[in-house]
């Protein structure tokens, strides 16, 4: 049974304020994960302490990396059941895990940070792990060339 929305709204906002788009239905998940060719982070949010104390702050810090994913989306385990179930179908070879962070590239899963890799770890350790995945799988966005002075 899903939690009351007023209880989890602040947990949702932790990611939304970072630029994450919430996916609340299976169709929304398919619209993004089924067609997106850019690098995409999928945060599997949850109410547990390791999400609040590790995953969400770790993700926030990781986004300060120079190289980062192009698209940020989230599903909320235990709340948006249909969306979470559909997202997990894209994570071939991994059992359901929440919280978790998946990195997709060209529609394929290239990295997965599971709950057992989040529990008991400091957010900065989680951020470093995610940054390493971004550095390996994401592209640097070239800066615009400087225009000559007029």
Regions found by a protein language model. Give the residues of each.
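N-terminal leader/targeting and pre-domain segments
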Residues: 1-37, 138-141, 145-149
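Thiol-based oxidoreductase modules, predominantly thioredoxin-like and allied folds used
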Residues: 23, 44, 67-86
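Conserved strand-to-helix beginnings and helix N-cap segments that scaffold or border functional pockets
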Residues: 52-57, 84-85, 123-124
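Short, well-ordered amphipathic alpha-helices
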Residues: 58-60, 88, 134
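Short acidic (Asp/Glu) patches
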Residues: 84-97
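Non-catalytic, surface beta->alpha helical segment in thiol-disulfide oxidoreductase systems
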Residues: 94-142
């Amino acid at each position: 049974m899903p939690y009351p929305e007023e209880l989890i709204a602040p947990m949702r906002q932790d990611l939304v304020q970072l630029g994450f788009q919430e996916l609340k239905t299976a169709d929304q998940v398919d619209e993004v994960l089924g067609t997106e060719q850019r690098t995409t982070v999928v945060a599997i949010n949850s109410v547990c302490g390791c999400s609040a104390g590790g995953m969400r702050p770790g993700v926030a810090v990781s986004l300060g990396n120079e190289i980062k994913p192009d698209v940020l989306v989230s599903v909320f385990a235990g709340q948006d059941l249909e969306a979470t179930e559909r997202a997990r179908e894209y994570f071939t070879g991994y059992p359901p895990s929440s919280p978790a962070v998946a990195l997709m590239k060209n529609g394929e899963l290239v990295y997965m940070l599971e709950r057992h890799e989040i529990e008991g770890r400091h957010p900065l350790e989680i951020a470093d792990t995610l940054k390493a995945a971004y550095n390996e799988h994401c592209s640097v966005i070239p800066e615009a060339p400087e225009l000559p002075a007029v």
